[in-house]
Amino acid sequence: MGQKTAVGSLLKSIGNSGQGKVVAGWGAVPVMAFVGVLLLVFLVILLQIYNQSLLLQGFSVDWNGVN
């Protein structure tokens, strides 16, 4: 089929090293929770700007200019 190279063998050993194994403990859950909270805050700010419940000086939300 194909030739075996040193780089290919190295990448294969790195890629398959953790296959089928579950890390004990919480793993990446705290990081994902933090990212989820940041996304939620961002979406709430966008919703407040859209509903004009968050007023910014010098910034008006007017959809008449949108074509």
UniProtKB/Swiss-Prot annotation:
One of its GO terms (molecular function) is phosphate ion binding. It comes from the Bacteria. GO terms for biological process: photosynthesis; protein stabilization. One of its GO terms (cellular component) is plasma membrane-derived thylakoid membrane. It is a single-pass membrane protein. InterPro entries: PSII_PsbH (IPR001056), PSII_PsbH_sf (IPR036863). The chain crosses the membrane at residues 27-47. PSII is composed of 1 copy each of membrane proteins PsbA, PsbB, PsbC, PsbD, PsbE, PsbF, PsbH, PsbI, PsbJ, PsbK, PsbL, PsbM, PsbT, PsbX, PsbY, Psb30/Ycf12, peripheral proteins PsbO, CyanoQ (PsbQ), PsbU, PsbV and a large number of cofactors. It forms dimeric complexes. Belongs to the PsbH family. This is Photosystem II reaction center protein H. It comes from Prochlorococcus marinus (strain SARG / CCMP1375 / SS120). The gene is psbH.
